[in-house]
Structure formats: C-alpha cells, structure tokens
Amino acid sequence: DGVYFENGLLKEWPSEGPELLWETMELGKGYSSPVIVDGRLYITGMDEEGTQEIFFAYSLDGKKLYQTAYGVPWTDTYPETRTTPTIENGKAYVISGSGEIVCLDTADGKIVWKVDGGKKFERMTGKWGTSECPLVFDNKVIYTPGGNQTTMVALDAETGETVWKSEPLGEHSSYTSPLLVMNNGKIKIVGVTGKSVFGVNPETGKIEWTFRDWGRSPEDMAKGFESIAPNTPLYDNGRLFVCNGYNMGSFMLRLNVDATKADLV
C-alpha cells in the first residue's frame, strides 16, 4: 500500500540522485513491479518473441538465479506482461494476460501447478486482457475471470483445485486485483468488474453485496465504456474508495457493521 515501516530511510534523494547498484535489460516488455522476499527479487517479463511470459528471480546484487516461462500473454492490445508476483510460503503465484493461474517454487522456479483459468472458467475480459495480481489468503488463490459461469474463484494454493466459485454477474472483469479487508473483525474480499463493485465471503464465495450505480451517462454506456477500473480500491475504517478511468469518476462506499452491505457515502 505504499507505506513502509523500515528504519533509516532517506528523507530526500541526494542532489546527484541515488546510486545505481545494478540494472538488467533482459526482462522484455511489461508492467510488473518487483517483489523482494527473503533476499531475492522476483519480477515478470516477456521473451523476445512476445509469445511467453517469464518469471525471473535475482539476488539482491543483480545476479540472475533463474527464469521460467509460465504462460501465454495477452495477444491483442498491449501484449506486455501485467501481473506482479504474489509470494507466500516459498511459492510464487502469477496470472498471465490470457488468464492462466500459475504456482511456482521460488527455490528453483519450477512450476508446481497451472490452471488455464481463461478457458476453465470461461473468462470474459475487456480489450486489455487479464491484469490482476493474485490474492493469496487462507491457503486459497483468488482470481476474477468474470463472465457468465462465475465472477470470482478460489483455488487451493497447494494443488490448484477449485475450492469455490461465486455466482456470475455476467460482466467483464476489470483490471484491478482482489482486496482483502477486515471490517469490525469480519474478513471479506472486495472485487471489481467492468460494471460493479462487490463483496465476497472468503469461506464460501458468496457475493454478499454489489454496487452498480457508478453515475455513468447513457452516452458513455453506449460507447462501451466499462471494464476500465485501473486501480484496486482503497480501504480504511469501513470505507472503500473506488476510482475509474476515462472520465467515469470516483466514489466512496461505506460498509455496514458485518460488511454484508455497502452504501454510497
């Protein structure tokens, strides 16, 4: 969330800028952010041909430890890799632009399991493909395919087997990642589609509330302006702040006591 609790951080950069320790030019195109866990840096990239997404591991002095091709990128507009890896208990979880959910062993980069979520769950996405990062919680990997079969699914983090599927909203997925929130001791998952914000029970997958009144004009809806939520909602003290792109505006919701309902503030 952009908040750091480390000691000794610089209050400002030196006038000549921070010292460059190392760099690499072998990642290919992509929008992934680096993740540093247990003295290693993990990031996703692309091969030179643009046909495979690649999971990279580096030591903190810049030595490449391994790379693993794990999935097929989105092949339409902007086919660059999207997902930032989620690291949990010695495993890395990534989602390809075509909707493959993949678990890798961080020790050697070998694929532990792989599920073609785009095909299995009949994914329905916008014109820029799948861009979410996996949420890992309670030994479950959360993914939002959208569409007419389901909206959000949970996979077993160890095996990739389906744990639950939520009901379908019949809407495109967005470009946000699932958000885990705790409201008055109740843990919920908040997700976003192209038309809705919704809350999910993490134990059962039941969608407990939806919010669709985004204030979009009929003209915008006629143009097909949906599925463009770019940022995961922000949560604080029972409130959710949701933003959208292309002049669609932003709004704030307030969860009720047990987080089974959300109303516009």
Where are these regions (language model features)?
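Noncatalytic, solvent-exposed loop/strand surfaces
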Residues: D1-V265
